[in-house]
């Protein structure tokens, strides 16, 4: 059980002067007048707690005045802890309207008395160290909500009694009333400060059954809100409850105080600004029809939380910050007179630091949709957006500044954030903070403000200078500016006139991307850095032309130009893509949204696991129900994730082998999700087969976890069912064979059909039993019999890469067990070796290598390394394991088959081929031609294998192929 507040240890405060003893006499005298004998005795004892009260009264004129006038506020604290008493006060507030005789005047008086008592107790608990600032804010928020609630209930009942509105329940007037009161800012976040304004917006749910004529309801409820303002805000002899602010509502200069929901939604969707999105992050129903309030916020969700990263918001947020900079109290960091909310290094900078990143990424990361600043700083660190040090620094700084804010406001109960210029008042703030002298407080204060400024500047103010002085860049008029042509030539462009033409086209707004004045303004700011970056690469003109094609396809350029301004490193990446990777350039030209993922701070530090991808996809598909929309969303998600894996390859963050695992994990998830969507849609029409279960085997590079950027997926669909099953049980029943054939075709279409969002994966079913001559769906029984009695050796080789990737988990396990049993069947090494040699000869005849860079088909290339691995598995030289990659198998080759030197050579060959092949497949759509490739690609290839020039790479490939060819012949000589 907690001790009574006045009998527990209270944080000692240094008094401002010796006047405390006189103030104690005054409060003791008033207590005696009110017959508060226990309190009189308590003060007479002069314990340490009394010294605390004495110090508080010397430091805060407001607290002194209220305590001397109302010593009864302290009496309960002789017997109970402060939270118990505050709970009683909140309960009392909630019951004020229960009296049938209550009128507006009595309500206002009662609210002010209760608020004043709670206000004093919260201050004492805060100053004494019994409350942290978070607990103080929570109680202030509860008090604010309770006051709003009781006042609104009173007004709703009165309107109902006068026939102005109709309530579903007089006892619970807020329920289904259709009147929504949202708390924003500190109230919405549950973080009210000591003398805080309360930000509110009032909406009318026109769909409520109790809302009749809408224009009449707007009038009635707007008048009700005006009375609510009077009840809560008006200063009387007993003070006020809270100051209310309704200026955050849509277009406050021309809209009523109570606004219909549909009108509000139209406003936000059509005219809403980014600062309003930022405000809505903290929005929460605090009074009225809360069910309707939550419904409204759900409808507003897409406006606040955009699915794609929103970097255009940064400029707007920054412009708000610049307006704050213009305030007379912003200036430099100081102590006396500094605005600890709006000033440099203040509370608002921490809030903007958080809210900006919430606006940018909250649509993609639900963890960032919280209302509270500290919790979101923690999440930003957890997600990798900020470092642990940054998170800890800002959390500690926020706590310090909120405590300072409270103490400034406790001096006179004023909504101010200015540290006093007056030395005595400034000292009072320092002492209320627990310091013994002002100098220590100033030292810590300045340190905190500097820490906040540093972290805020890293996000907003220390961006790379994009307006570089590089010479004339004039793109107006019809003629080329001669000095601009010289500048472009100096930058590295060979066709300066063509570049001028491109830039003129952009700046005159002929593309959708630059039709808005804002987009052209952002482009103008970006142009010097843009041209310098492109000019620095080989064949700069060619890359710039690709960039021009990219911009032609953009529906809007504001987002991109803002993104590049806010993240200059992305400009370098974009230039690299345009100069070295035509395939990626084509992708972002068709689907520019994939570039958003580049803003994920973990992009180069973490490889996406299947679990990570599952979580991301779950959030991405949130609220998506129609079958076609699911398929489109899967394509969008896969495009972006493939692009991000590709960026990791380009940056050298992952090897080719790791990229194979990442591409495979993504494909596994996409196929599994597509299968689930197809099953649901197909069974809706055709029902289910009794005991029917489906399993999909991934074959080829999908099965061995070695996919590349442009890989097809090789699949086999296997099914089983109860013995007595004959036909499905749906509205349009199908016999078993027909059912699974159509089901498989539906699955193939879901994966490979070209929709508005492209193709998910090209599908190849030719590795199934009997290939193109066999059924597209194979029963488990047929699968077993075929591989045990009819399969060719090449089919056993292919089966070594089989892996269950989607379907019924238990059935998949049975399927994989059967694959293991089939691979365990005895095979004569000579027969296998002969078959492999014949197969290799046939392939070489029918599909000869195109050039020395045909890493797959050339003699001693990828195919030969894979044949060696597969041969080792079906001849049981290496134990078979589901999902083993080629590298895994090579690692287990025994020295009895190959000496260690040969095994090392195979490993090196596999690594070399994989790194080169992943890079080539990533960057190019067509076959690689060393005589006609993007200049940037050669640099990427060199860095991927650590060689200085292409001749050395070609020599390395040649030597490696000869080594592999020799090993292949050695193994296959049986």
From Swiss-Prot:
GO terms classed as biological process: regulation of glutamine family amino acid metabolic process
Chain positions covered by the region annotation Adenylyl removase: 1-464
Catalytic activity: [glutamine synthetase]-O(4)-(5'-adenylyl)-L-tyrosine + phosphate = [glutamine synthetase]-L-tyrosine + ADP; [glutamine synthetase]-L-tyrosine + ATP = [glutamine synthetase]-O(4)-(5'-adenylyl)-L-tyrosine + diphosphate
Enzyme class (EC, first level): transferase
Entry's Gene Ontology molecular function annotations: [glutamate-ammonia-ligase] adenylyltransferase activity; [glutamine synthetase]-adenylyl-L-tyrosine phosphorylase activity; ATP binding; magnesium ion binding
Entry's EC annotation: 2.7.7.89, 2.7.7.42
Record has Nucleotide-binding as a keyword: yes
Cross-referenced InterPro entries: GlnE, GlnE_rpt_dom, NT_sf, PII_UdlTrfase/GS_AdlTrfase
Keywords: ATP-binding, Magnesium, Multifunctional enzyme, Nucleotide-binding, Nucleotidyltransferase, Transferase
Region (Adenylyl transferase): 468-974
Assigned GO CC terms: cytosol
Needed cofactors: Mg(2+)
Superkingdom as given in the UniProt entry: Bacteria
Family: Belongs to the GlnE family.
Annotated function: Involved in the regulation of glutamine synthetase GlnA, a key enzyme in the process to assimilate ammonia. When cellular nitrogen levels are high, the C-terminal adenylyl transferase (AT) inactivates GlnA by covalent transfer of an adenylyl group from ATP to specific tyrosine residue of GlnA, thus reducing its activity. Conversely, when nitrogen levels are low, the N-terminal adenylyl removase (AR) activates GlnA by removing the adenylyl group by phosphorolysis, increasing its activity.
Listed name of the protein: Bifunctional glutamine synthetase adenylyltransferase/adenylyl-removing enzyme
Organism: Bartonella quintana (strain Toulouse)
């Amino acid at each position: 059980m907690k001790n009574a507040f006045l009998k527990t240890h209270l944080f000692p405060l240094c008094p401002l002067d010796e006047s405390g003893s006189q103030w104690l006499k005054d409060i003791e005298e008033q207590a005696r007048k009110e017959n508060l004998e226990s309190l009189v005795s308590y003060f007479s004892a002069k314990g340490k707690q009394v010294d605390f009260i004495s110090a508080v009264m010397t430091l805060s004129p407001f607290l002194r005045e209220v305590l001397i006038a109302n010593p009864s506020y302290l009496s309960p604290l002789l017997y109970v802890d402060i939270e118990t008493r505050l709970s009683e006060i909140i309960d009392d507030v909630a019951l004020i309207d229960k009296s049938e005789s209550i009128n507006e005047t009595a309500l206002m008086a009662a609210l002010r008395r209760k608020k004043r008592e709670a206000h004093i107790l919260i201050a004492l608990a805060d100053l004494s160290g019994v409350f942290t600032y978070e607990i103080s804010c929570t109680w202030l928020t509860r008090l604010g909500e309770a006051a709003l609630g009781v006042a609104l209930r009173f007004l709703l009942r009165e309107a109902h009694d006068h026939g102005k509105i109709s309530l579903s329940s007089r006892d619970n007037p807020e329920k289904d009333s259709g009147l929504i009161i949202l708390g924003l800012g500190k109230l919405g976040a549950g973080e009210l400060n000591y003398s805080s304004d309360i930000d509110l917006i009032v909406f009318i749910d026109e769909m409520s059954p109790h809302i009749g004529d809408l224009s009449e309801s707007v009038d009635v409820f707007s008048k009700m809100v005006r009375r609510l303002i009077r009840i809560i805000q008006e200063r009387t002899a007993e003070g006020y409850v809270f100051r209310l602010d309704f200026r955050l509502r849509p277009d406050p200069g021309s809209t009523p105080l109570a606004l219909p929901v549909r009108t509000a939604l139209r406003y936000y969707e059509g005219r809403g600004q980014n600062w309003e999105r930022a405000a809505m992050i903290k929005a929460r129903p605090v009074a009225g029809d809360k069910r309707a309030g939550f419904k409204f916020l759900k409808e507003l969700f897409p406006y606040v939380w955009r699915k794609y990263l929103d970097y255009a918001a940064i400029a707007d947020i920054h412009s708000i910050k610049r307006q704050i900079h213009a305030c007379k109290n912003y200036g430099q960091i100081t102590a006396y007179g500094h605005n600890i909310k709006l000033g440099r290094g203040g509370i608002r900078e921490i809030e903007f630091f958080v809210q900006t990143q919430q606006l940018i990424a909250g649509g993609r990361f639900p963890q960032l949709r919280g209302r509270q600043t500290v919790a979101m700083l923690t999440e930003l660190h957890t997600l990798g957006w900020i470092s642990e040090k940054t998170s800890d620094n800002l959390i500690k700084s926020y706590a310090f500044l909120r405590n300072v804010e409270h103490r400034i406001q406790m001096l006179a109960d004023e909504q101010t954030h200015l540290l006093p210029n007056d030395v005595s008042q400034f000292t009072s703030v320092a002492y209320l903070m627990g310091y013994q002298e002002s100098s220590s407080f100033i030292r810590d204060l300045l340190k905190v403000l500097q820490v906040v400024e540093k972290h805020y500047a890293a996000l907003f103010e220390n961006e790379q200078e994009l307006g570089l002085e590089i010479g004339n860049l004039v793109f107006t008029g019809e003629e080329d500016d001669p000095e601009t042509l010289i500048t472009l030539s100096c930058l590295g462009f060979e066709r300066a006139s063509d570049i001028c033409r491109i830039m003129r086209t952009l700046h005159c707004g002929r593309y959708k991307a630059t039709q808005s004045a804002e987009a052209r303004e952002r482009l103008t700011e970006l142009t010097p850095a843009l041209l310098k970056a492109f000019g620095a690469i080989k064949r700069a003109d060619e890359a710039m032309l690709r960039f021009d094609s990219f911009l032609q396809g953009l529906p809007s350029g504001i987002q991109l130009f803002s993104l590049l301004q806010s993240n200059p490193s992305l400009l370098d990446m974009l230039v690299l893509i345009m100069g070295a990777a035509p395939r990626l350039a084509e992708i972002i030209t068709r689907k520019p949204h994939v570039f958003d993922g580049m803003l994920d701070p973990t992009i180069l530090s973490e490889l996406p696991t299947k679990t990570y991808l599952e979580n991301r996809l779950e959030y991405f598909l949130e609220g998506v129900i129609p079958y076609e929309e699911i398929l489109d969303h899967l394509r969008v998600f896969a495009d972006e994730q493939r692009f991000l894996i590709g960026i990791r390859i380009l940056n050298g963050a992952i090897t080719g082998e790791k990229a194979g695992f990442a591409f495979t994990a993504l494909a596994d998830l996409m196929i599994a999700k597509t299968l689930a969507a197809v099953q649901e849609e197909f069974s809706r029409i055709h029902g289910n087969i009794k005991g029917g279960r489906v399993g999909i085997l991934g074959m080829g590079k999908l099965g061995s976890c070695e996919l590349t950027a442009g890989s097809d997926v090789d699949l086999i669909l296997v099914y089983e069912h109860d013995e007595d099953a004959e036909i499905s049980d749906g509205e349009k029943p199908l016999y078993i064979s027909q059912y699974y054939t159509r089901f498989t075709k539906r699955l193939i279409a879901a994966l490979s059909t070209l929709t508005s969002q492209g193709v998910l994966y090209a599908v190849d079913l030719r590795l199934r039993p009997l290939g193109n001559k066999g059924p597209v769906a194979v029963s488990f029984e047929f699968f077993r019999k075929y591989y045990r009695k009819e399969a060719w050796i090449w089919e056993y080789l292919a089966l070594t890469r089989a892996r269950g990737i989607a379907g019924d988990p238990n059935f998949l396990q049975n399927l994989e067990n059967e694959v293991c049993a089939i691979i365990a069947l005895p095979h004569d090494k000579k027969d296998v070796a002969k078959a492999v040699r014949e197969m290799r000869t046939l392939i070489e005849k029918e599909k000869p290598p195109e050039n020395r860079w045909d890493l797959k088909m050339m003699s001693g290339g990828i195919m030969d390394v894979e044949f060696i691995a597969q041969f080792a598995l079906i001849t049981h030289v290496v134990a078979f394991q589901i999902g083993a990659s080629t590298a895994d198998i090579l690692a287990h080759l025994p020295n009895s088959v190959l000496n260690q030197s040969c095994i090392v050579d195979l490993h090196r060959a596999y690594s070399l081929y994989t790194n080169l092949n992943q890079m080539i497949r990533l960057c190019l759509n067509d076959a690689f031609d060393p005589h006609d490739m993007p200049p940037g690609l050669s640099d990427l290839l060199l860095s991927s294998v650590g060689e200085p020039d292409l001749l050395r790479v070609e020599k390395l490939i040649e030597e490696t192929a000869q080594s592999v060819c020799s090993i292949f012949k050695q193994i296959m000589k049986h």
